[in-house]
Regions:
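N-terminal non-globular leader segments, chiefly Sec-dependent signal peptides
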Residues: 1-81
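Short, compact, well-ordered microdomains
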Residues: 72-103
Length: 103
């Protein structure tokens, strides 16, 4: 499934919890479309995020992001039971994703 990164916030380890990550390359990641499969999200292990395209539509098919270890995650389904939103908390960040149409 494809998801858009809608926000990246501090988890509280290196910034005030819940505030937007504006350090380093974090702002550039907002709006990027990624491929995520919740079956591959494991608590205690880093998450590998496969970028599909940048926010302007430029292909990023061969780019990856390795996060710090996942602490927890939650999903929100739509009425048909399809995952619409995913929030993944890692040791350093809280990523929020929204489902987008597959290519």
């Amino acid at each position: 499934m494809l998801y858009k990164i809608t926000s990246i916030k501090h988890s509280g380890t290196c910034g005030e919890r819940g505030t937007d990550r504006i350090d380093d390359r974090y702002p550039q990641r907002i709006g990027r479309v990624v491929k995520l499969d919740i079956d591959y999200i494991e608590i205690g292990y880093p998450l590998i995020i496969q970028y599909i395209r940048d926010s302007d539509g430029t292909s990023m098919r061969f780019s990856l992001l390795k996060t710090s270890c996942v602490k927890n995650y939650i999903t929100i389904d739509d009425l048909e039971g399809i995952i619409k939103y995913i929030t993944i908390e890692t040791e350093n960040s809280i990523f929020e994703f929204e489902r987008v149409n597959d290519e």
